[in-house]
């Protein structure tokens, strides 16, 4: 609806040309009485030429249009070519259509911006990547097209409430910054340990055993040398179960003990057996 339709009730009066006759003097008017003033809500009309016996009229004051901010925004969007406008374009439409909003723009522009963000009937449309410019577009929700009675912006039926906010459609592929990534391939299942694989592992053969220290024979002859070595151990696990080499028999140890007795008793501080043919003078390196 055009904004000037609301103010079309006033009759159109002829205008005064600069070369026309000058208005007569108002000396015959009653003293102490002001001329009549007509207050309206639209644009000012040109002063009418006072005829004989008529009083002079003042210019009409600029009144506020009888439209709410929601109606002003909906009016601007309805007159847009693509039914969408930026915030700056909405400001421009209002100031060009209504002269009242040309003064003090900061007050009413804040109200326009708040009504755009707080009312569900207005939807923000992002700007396409290939469309340069500043700011997003605003459009009217298609479900709110019948928000006003009979297309009149003076009467609004009820507050529009959107049940769910639909997501804006994604831009087409040429305008997308990156092509859509393919779906990742399913990961292979994790490898599980099986009992057969654990039993099939071969144990590494252990390293060479440290040589056992020789038995120390006490000076007392009543204690037989290497008696502890000749006694069998309390517990001897099966060597084939542990994968260890079989222990040495006790006969070489007894033979070694016999050779130690033939060499004679150990002196004080000697904790080793001197083998035959050992060169003298090397004990200090042991």
UniProtKB/Swiss-Prot annotation:
Key words of the record: DNA-binding, Nucleus, Transcription, Transcription regulation
CDD domains, sorted: FH_FOXE (cd20019)
Protein name from the UniProt record: Forkhead box protein E3
BP GO annotations: anatomical structure morphogenesis; camera-type eye development; cell development; cell differentiation; ciliary body morphogenesis; cornea development in camera-type eye; epithelial cell proliferation; eye development
Domain of life: Eukaryota
Matches recorded under SMART domains: FH
Keyword DNA-binding assigned: yes
Region listing for Disordered, in residue ranges: 1-62
GO CC aspect terms: nucleus; transcription regulator complex
Subcellular location: Nucleus
